[in-house]
Amino acid sequence: MSLAGKNVVFVGGLGFIAYEACKYLMNNDLASLFVFDVLDKPEAIKALQEINPKTKVYYTKFDITNKESIKQSLADVISKVQHIDALINGAGILTDPNVELTMNINLIGLINTTLEALPLMDKNKHGRGGVIVNIASVLGLEPCPPAAVYCASKFGVVGFSRSLGDPFYYEHTGVAVVTFCPGLTDTPLKNNIGSKYTFDYSKEIGEKLNSSKTQKPEVCGAHLAQAIELMDNGAIYISNQGTLTKVKPSVYWEPTY
């Protein structure tokens, strides 16, 4: 999908990987970029706008744990530009001791945002199709013993996204659903993991993860923008150590008819 002239909504767009992706997107002649975030960083929004004055950048204070905030924020986008062409769900935290907050932000909020946006993008309703990219993690594909709650939330994102990425939904709506799984990236999410393990004693098995090789957020952000452009329904992409790879998950069970 060419991004030129498109309207993009980026949830959690001021995070490290997300912000790098936003900078990349601003060089693609978007019609508009809506940045939804709980953080308020006017200088960051200003810097985005300066990349390409022709693309209108909007900032919305956004609480992904509040369904009314989700509904009103997306309705505001429609009132301003009529159509959403791409939605990126990028909000996320790593704080295993707070199970409810982890699930509410990483999974439930993402689900609610997707379910609210999809009918607005549906080509058979008032939309014109497009793409939804849900940011999971490589830890949504493989277990992570020291961060079991975070891992569970990201496994949920993968399962939810793969389900909505079924051809049945794409043929009906014209909206591709893509899963993007960053590997370990040099961001505060990874750097602060030491105090956020599932249990205090999980640190014993978490130190290797905390000291493993990472990639730069600029590289991961560029990969994310590429995944948006590819608009490959049902695809799962891993961004790891500078390489973007499409992966095919194993099939362990299929219904018998």
From Swiss-Prot:
- Keyword Iron (UniProt): no
GO MF assignments = alcohol dehydrogenase (NAD+) activity
Q: What is this protein called?
A: Alcohol dehydrogenase 1
- Keyword Iron assigned: no
Task: Give the quaternary structure.
Answer: Homodimer.
Q: Which keywords describe this protein according to UniProt?
A: NAD, Oxidoreductase
Active-site feature positions: Y150 (proton acceptor)
Pfam family of the protein (one): adh_short
Q: Please give an example of a GO cellular component term from this record.
A: cytoplasm
The family annotation for this protein states: Belongs to the short-chain dehydrogenases/reductases (SDR) family.
Q: Per its UniProt entry, what is the enzyme's top EC class, as one word?
A: oxidoreductase
Q: Which reaction does it catalyse?
A: a primary alcohol + NAD(+) = an aldehyde + NADH + H(+); a secondary alcohol + NAD(+) = a ketone + NADH + H(+)
Instruction: Report which superkingdom the organism of origin falls in.
Output: Eukaryota
Gene behind this protein: ADH1
Residues involved in substrate binding: S137
